[in-house]
Design a protein with these regions (language model features):
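Sec-dependent, cleavable N-terminal signal peptides
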Residues: 1-21
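Surface-exposed repetitive/solenoidal architectures
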Residues: 19-682
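Short, surface-exposed loop/turn motifs with a glycine/proline- and acidic-biased composition
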Residues: 702-705, 710-711, 716, 733-766
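Beta-strand signatures of extracellular beta-sandwich domains
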Residues: 721-725
Length: 776
């Protein structure tokens, strides 16, 4: 940094002789510091006998309003001449002494550089320098043309602590900070800034505390900012704490507004390659261009234990995000959250782009975008090519095109995460790709142990969990209703990849105001991939080509069922409308009805079946139409009969059957995940720790009365029991399960119920009934 001083010094390497009328008491030592009693004394610091490495102390408040009328005959500065200006361009301009404000106030200090030089109260605080216990109010510091400005110092290599700034205005083209222009391997701690910071002439590095926090050893700690920060339209790297951060920022509390600027704007910093810890930003962001976010514009470092709670984060073009614009491949974000309203042409609740790691984090609020095609909006991350784990979004997503509750486009890894907000396109029949969790999962995308519960409304290719899947999705589910115009499903709109151990419970219908819809499937609209161990229980209502599980299958579906009610007018099928490829070990247990008297081409199991069905069943009691030769017709009461399934491949491996169940259920719903052997190498599925919907609890019985089993789902930890009552309400038996944590538990209820008779089985936790199941 010395080289920067030398270069910028130009013709000013010769120190000017500055007049001063200061007459300070003291000896300049730690025991007897020079005493600054008035403005004339302040101007004398660092000049003549008052050395740049001496000790100084304020003994009174200083009114510096006289600086407004001062000019320099030898320098470009109007007003106060910065301490160290006499040695500008040399190392002697560093203040390496101690300046103790003793909690006194310097007010109305005015310093303006008209030409090519920076300004502040100090030119530079050196590596040994200390400025502390100082208050400044109503000061005005400005540089018109080049480089840096700050209320306290242009540059800091030392220590600035316990400083309070109120109503100051600082402006410069670049490296502009409320306290310091550039903090290079120095420390700024226990400081407060309230005022205005302006970046002019479309330059970079503007911050509420420091313009640039450079060097790995630079530290900003325990600071508060309430700044009105503005930049010209093409200014870059703006943050309410620091324009850029290469060091450490810890415990920052931020309020205010950051307005204009081009790219890389953040509530803490525009760009971070260092560490940010325990920061809270409540500042609103209004920017013109990309990578604008509530905390950091662009991150390649570490961010942890931090949050954004902002009323508004807005970007005119190319995207805004609640927490970070871009998290690069080296970036790590953990234990952080955002609660904000985000609006741009593309909006992300937490991030626009993630190539690094995000874990244990969440987003809440609302995500909106302009009503135009070609842009993406999501509740958590717009595009993920990295890793996201143990995170969630409760944000609502409202826009037109390409929407998702958690990640719009995923080609990375997502594990143990969920989304609960709605995904709505304003009831438009146009627009493409909507997912309650992910919009599009690419061929390299892997999603495990995740779920979505929000309603999804989209023009086409809409799914309760994913709009379009080309990758792998394992052990995930969706419970939200889906309304669309074409190619939509309770779990997926289109599937070209692999879906294992998944289910959907939401109902399907048309967009409001549109009676017509096409290709709806209770689980998936169009399948051109591989699905194994999956089911759908929601009702399906679509005019053209609906199916209880899938509308059109041109892939492979194994070990699957649909139990909802299906209604349609044209080519409506119980399990599938059109099957072109392979179905195996599948059944339809719901009902099939025509939605209009002018219906055409129903199919109790399938309407068109040029493909193969190996071991398929349908509920003949639920179909009022002609028998279907594509699958075996079975009375609903007989669907739990074990002999029906003797021919099914690996039935005992994948299915559970007992007199407590109306039809077979899949083993994976009990928390056991049997290995699936595909065409290639075996797919190994480790038993996952499925996340559970907050507030959702469940008791699911299976097996026989003599060997009764249960799947217990808990949304919180607590002392858990299962109680069995007879029809008179008399308690018959209590099965103590002890302390159970949040999650899915497989429990043994052998001997809990009698061999005959109706019993009410109740799940209790901490003395409160959570769920009931009637055993007939």
């Amino acid at each position: 940094m010395i080289k920067k001083f030398m270069v910028l010094a130009g013709a000013l390497l010769v120190a000017p002789s500055l007049a001063t009328n200061g007459n300070m008491s003291g000896a300049g030592t730690a025991e007897s510091p020079w005493q600054i009693a008035d403005y004339e004394d302040l101007k004398a610091v660092g000049i003549g006998d008052y050395s740049m490495d001496g000790h100084y102390v304020l003994v009174a408040d200083i009114d510096a309003s006289a600086s407004r009328n001062e000019t320099s005959a030898t320098d470009s500065t109007a007003g106060f001449q910065p301490i160290g200006i006499a040695y500008f361009g040399t190392e002697q301009s560093y203040f390496d002494g101690v300046f103790d404000g003793a909690n006194h106030t310097i007010s109305k200090l005015y310093s303006m550089s008209n030409k090519e030089r920076s300004t502040a109260m100090f030119m530079a605080v050196g590596p040994k320098g200390v400025v502390k216990n100082l208050k400044m109010t109503d000061c005005y510091i400005t540089v018109k043309y080049v480089w840096a400005a700050g209320s306290v110092a242009v540059m800091n290599f030392g220590l600035i602590e316990n400083v309070e700034i109120k109503r100051d205005t600082v402006s410069a083209p670049s490296n502009t900070g409320g306290i310091v222009g550039i903090n290079e391997n120095g420390t700024v701690r226990d400081v407060t800034f309230e005022g205005v910071v302006l970046g002019i002439h479309d330059r970079d590095f503007i911050g509420g505390i420091v313009g640039a926090n450079t060097g790995a050893k630079s530290v900003i700690r325990n600071v508060k900012v309430n700044a009105d920060m503005r930049s010209s339209y093409y200014g870059n790297n703006l943050g309410l704490v620091a324009g850029i951060n290469e060091g450490t920022i810890v415990s920052a509390e931020i309020d205010g507004i950051l307005e204009h600027g081009n790219r890389f704007l953040g509530g803490v910093t525009g760009k971070n390659s260092g560490t940010i810890d325990s920061c809270v930003s409540r500042g609103s962001i209004f920017s013109m261009h990309e990578n604008s976010a509530g905390l950091v514009g662009y991150n390649s470092g570490t961010i942890k234990n931090s949050s954004v709670e902002a009323d508004s984060i807005y970007c005119e073009y190319r995207g805004a995000a609640g927490f970070v614009g871009t998290n690069d491949s080296t970036g790590v974000i953990e234990n952080s959250f955002v609660k904000a309203n985000v609006h741009s042409d593309s909006s992300g609740g937490f991030a626009l782009y993630n190539a690094g790691v995000i874990r244990n984090s969440y987003a809440e609020g609302s995500m909106t975008a302009d009503s135009m095609p070609g842009h993406c909006v999501s509740g958590f991350v717009v595009q993920n090519v990295g890793t996201i784990t143990n995170s969630y979004s409760k944000a609502d997503v409202d826009a037109f095109h390409k929407l998702a509750g958690f990640v719009f486009r995923n080609s990375g890894k997502i594990d143990s995460s969920y989304a609960t907000g709605h995904v709505l396109n304003g009831e438009r029949a146009s627009g493409d790709t909507y997912g309650g969790f992910v919009g599009q999962n690419d061929s390299t995308g892997i999603i495990t142990n995740s779920y979505a519960t929000g309603e999804v409304v989209g023009g086409m290719r809409a799914g309760g969990f994913v709009g379009i899947n080309h990758g792998k999705i394992h052990n995930s589910y969706a419970t939200g209703d889906v309304r669309s115009y074409s190619e939509f499903g309770g779990f997926a709109g289109n599937n070209y990849g692999e879906i294992l151990y998944a289910y959907a419970t939401g109902s399907l219908g048309s967009i409001k105001g549109y009676a017509t819809s096409y290709s709806a499937g209770g689980f998936v609209g169009i399948n051109d991939g591989y699905i194994n161990n999956a089911y759908a229980t929601g009702d399906v209502n679509s005019e053209f080509t609906p199916g209880g599980f899938v509308s059109r299958n041109i892939g492979t579906i194994k070990n699957a069922y649909a139990s909802g009610n299906v209604s349609g007018r044209i080519e409506f099928g119980g399990f599938v409308s059109t099957n072109v490829q392979n179905l195996e070990n599948v059944f339809f247990a719901g009902t099939l009805k025509a939605s209009s008297s002018d219906y055409n081409a129903p199919g109790c199991f399938a309407v068109q079946n040029p493909g193969t069905v190996k071991d398929g069943l349908y509920n003949k009691d639920g179909c009022e139409f002609e028998a279907d030769s594509a699958a075996k017709a079975v009375a609903f009461a007989d669907m739990k009969s074990a002999p029906l399934y003797k021919s099914w491949t690996d039935f005992d491996k994948f299915w559970v059957l007992g007199d407590t169940l109306s039809f077979p259920h899949l083993v994976f719903t009990t928390g056991v995940y049997p290995e699936i052997i595909g065409d290639g190498p075996p797919i190994e599925i480790a038993k996952p720790n499925m996340v559970v919907v907050k507030g959702a609890n469940g008791l699911k019985l299976y097996g026989t009365r003599q060997s009764l089993q249960a799947m217990v789902t808990l949304s919180r930890s607590g002392l858990t029991n299962v109680k069995v009552y007879n029809l008179k309400g008399t308690l018959q038996k209590t099965v103590s399960l002890g302390m159970l944590g949040e999650g899915v538990h497989h429990v043994n209820l052998n001997g809990a119920v009698d061999a005959h008779g109706v019993a009410l089985v109740v799940l209790e936790q901490n003395g409160k009934a959570l769920s009931r199941s009637l055993l007939r």
